[in-house]
Amino acid sequence: MKSEKEKTSKKSAVLDWAKAIIIAVVLAVLIRNFLFAPYVVDGESMEPTLHDRERIFVNMTVKYISDFKRGQIVVLNGENEHYVKRIIGLPGDTVQMKNDQLYINGKKVSEPYLAANKKKAKQDGYTLTDDFGPVKVPDDKYFVMGDNRRNSMDSRNGLGLFTKKQIAGTSKFVFFPFNEIRKTK
């Protein structure tokens, strides 16, 4: 027969394990829902920056502690799916594209992340981004575009503008496939 002390010791060990598992699950849920979350890039709209089926980690705290910045790659919560795009226009901005040059509030804006796409477009005899605008971004919205401008549904052509509440967070790095791990810029 087992002594009372042995029974209490086993019971205590089981309770300790149960507490540890419950704490781990609660922490995982909190981290996943409020700090960082994995997302899958769906489609080619962010090529060559991000590729179809890559997995990215998204910082979800940004929207609670600071404002979004122009040029950040964000995950947007649409009606039925999420989208990965780049913030181009901030609330209150006027966005225009003319002769493959982005203008924000009437000033030229450099887009170094488009260098490879612009070079290929020029070699193929077309512009990367069709002219549009000027578009005035309302005070509570963001204007977004994909880096693969010829193959991206975004604020120009169907997705419209997004509120801060619709932005899940900012992309920090690609974590899969493992041979492609890198920071996103």
From Swiss-Prot:
Gene name? sipA
The UniProt GO MF terms for this protein read: serine-type endopeptidase activity
Which keywords belong to this entry?
Cell membrane, Hydrolase, Membrane, Protease, Transmembrane, Transmembrane helix
Family as reported in the entry's similarity comment: Belongs to the peptidase S26 family.
The transmembrane segments are: 21-41
Q: What protein is this chain from?
A: Signal peptidase I
Can you state which reaction this protein catalyses?
A: Cleavage of hydrophobic, N-terminal signal or leader sequences from secreted and periplasmic proteins
Tell me which parts of the chain lie in the Cytoplasmic compartment: 1-20
Q: In which compartments does the protein localize?
A: Cell membrane
